[in-house]
Amino acid sequence: PGPVLLENVGGAQVLANLFPDRDALARSLGVDPRRFLPELGDLLSGKTRRRGAGTRHQDAVYGEVEVPLRDLKKLPFLTYYRGDGGPFLTAGIWIVRDPVHGVNLSYHRMMIAAGASEGTVRVVSDRGTDTALKNSGGRLDAAICIGVPAEVLFTASLSPAPDVNEMDLAARLGRIDLVRCKTVDLEVPASCQMVIEGTFTGE
């Protein structure tokens, strides 16, 4: 099996099974599949460095097109099964800044609630986002990125020590250009296809 691209699902493209096996993941990260773990370990630890890798902070704000909150349901959230409580975003990369530990990347499922400007998010207890919420008193800015570089997709799935910035890990695998969000104090990869900006309100 390989990646599956559905060209038109309610007017949007849907990509599934992007990394069907370890070899596909290795190739997408520019790593020799035969030396996947040692080569990847050397890069992530900083033992070896790639030419041109690193973060570059651009003096720019993300996004040429802005979708108002009232049109949030027009974004490509999918309803997977009959009886689902609503449409879901399943592979968005969440970026938050913990006031103690710094930037954290993670995956969270998000369901659009009845209100057009609201979403319900499952946050795993005592992991990165939950810790950031606790350290911030329950109010926390977030940027949800769709269509990010493979390096970011991969490092967002890791569970390094709390003080390790997964975006910096991604930048050890390749160059990541970062731009500012419009409404929250965060940076996102410039090549994202879509960014949803919002705030955990503590309610």
Language model features with spans:
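Extended, highly charged
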Residues: 1-203
